[in-house]
Amino acid sequence: MRLFPKCFALLSLVAAFANADAQTPALDTMVDHAAATFIKGGSWIGLSVAVIRDNKIRIHNYGTTRTDKTLYEIGSISKTFTSLLLARAVEDKKVKLDDDIRLYIKGDYPNLQYNGNPIRLLHLVNLTSSLPNNMPDWSGLVGKVDPDSMAFKIVQLNEHYTREDFFRDLHDVKLDTVPGLVPRHSNTAGALLAYLLENIYHKPYEELLAEFLTGTLNMKHTHLNVPADQLSLLAKGYNDKGMQQPYIVENQAAAWSVRSNIDDMAKYLAYQLDERNAAVRLTHLATWGDTANFGLGFNWLLGSFEGHREVHHDGTTFGFTSYCLLVPDLHFAVMIMTNEYGNMQDKLSTMASDLFEKTYFTAAERSSPAFGYSPAIHTLLTQLDKQGWDHTAEAATGIQLDENEVNAWAYGLLQHGEKQKALDIFKLNTALHPQSYNAYDSEAEGFDNVGDTANAIVYYKRSLELNPNNTNAVTQLKRLQK
């Protein structure tokens, strides 16, 4: 059980509450506890949390940023706005998801295909476009620029980068794989989609956003460009050293620099929870992978947890991090925003997941070794408890198990100190998937954790045979064979 320090008064915790019911005080306390731990040690940190449960919105603000009107950069969550506009265009029958994107670009772009396979509109929103991560490309700065100066250099590259520059550089893009196959983060795809939507609707992107989203939802503090009378509400962003960071240049706003506050984002999440809306429902459908394990919607990451479908996304900029979690069938959502970047994504996602789990599951349910995994893992655990952990193959007979989930479950056991049980599950996975280099790599780690160096070496070598490009195996073998 996780324990939290009783230091709430010292942190200037402030919470604004909606009308309470019998259950919300416990939820409020959980948020307070989580926030206390999060903020401790960072005097610059502000934190805003919105929780939606049973159609009630609860908003909490903590630390140095203490108002639900404070503006944060929301990073890549901006892409879900653009995705929603594309879904609206589909519902309006202005476009089809399998349309070649070049139908909506002025000029000739023969390069935006791979072996005759074009980039389609769908690929721009499910991370499979094969477009570069950023334009202008700043990857060359890595290793050449002081990390503390990197953000400022990137801003310099972008501050005079125009729409014309973007489409000029788009001519030079070379795809390295068939679009639609490999998920890969791309701010370029997000920015390009906004430009295409402008061509489709013959309106500026900012006007489209106001017409179909922010205006409709009365999101008066959500902007691509913050108006002068609201600039005082824009929080300062920091890295994990407490150094103030620059804001993202507005020319990439549709991809990763919308500014908003917790009040507006709570309205947005409430809108996203209503899947009676055809456009919303479309954005939550798996277009790559599946919701049972891991899937991609329209810039939404999809999964399932204890039989409940989850829809989530995170966003980072140079000085801000945000995370949102939706559980549509329970009408539950969490939005968390903070003015710090640096190892914050995992902290925010863990906070959101903890709030969800502690709200809907008992302590006994949460203590199960299979908690959070599919029914198949629950069935396997039941059989293992009956037959013994040294009979994994027999216990797994007749159960449809996913390699990645079994691997993740084994690592979960490892994190909870169950080293031998984790190794047993790693062994099961290699038995089920004898041609998987990753399964052997994981089993090698399992042997390493129980102190069996000889077998760790054997299985890392086997993993390397299956995939000579497995750099982790190379690194571990060098360490183990010293």
Predicted feature residues:
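Catalytic loop of the DD-peptidase/beta-lactamase superfamily, centered on the K-T-G motif
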Residues: Q23-N61, L103, P136, K144-V145, ...
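Canonical positions in the second alpha-helix
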Residues: N429, R462-S463
